[in-house]
Amino acid sequence: QFIQGIVGQTLTVEEAYQLARQTGLFLLSVAKHQLGSLDRVEQIVKLVAFVRCGADFMQQPKVANGVSDLLVEVFGEQGKHARSAVGVAALPGGMCFEAELIVKTC
């Protein structure tokens, strides 16, 4: 389920953190489907997080932590990654959060 909203206006940072975490679970399900098993993940390389927010909102990293924290919980040291957390004015369908994940496999 995609949640619409603007972080810092219609959604709190904590709500957005939890939604980002759900996005992380979705990304892991896609990875498992594509790879056959998450055991094939050697390293989480990079996460790019897009947070829909107003121009004065500066807490994008706190929102992106929802995905980052999950990846470290699941993969330990292999879950530590480079990251960009970007604030944007709009996302498809009015979504509040979107993410891309780069994974190194074995």
Q: What do the PLM-derived regions correspond to, one by one?
A:
Residues 1-106:
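Short, polar/acidic, helix-capping and beta-turn segments at strand->helix junctions
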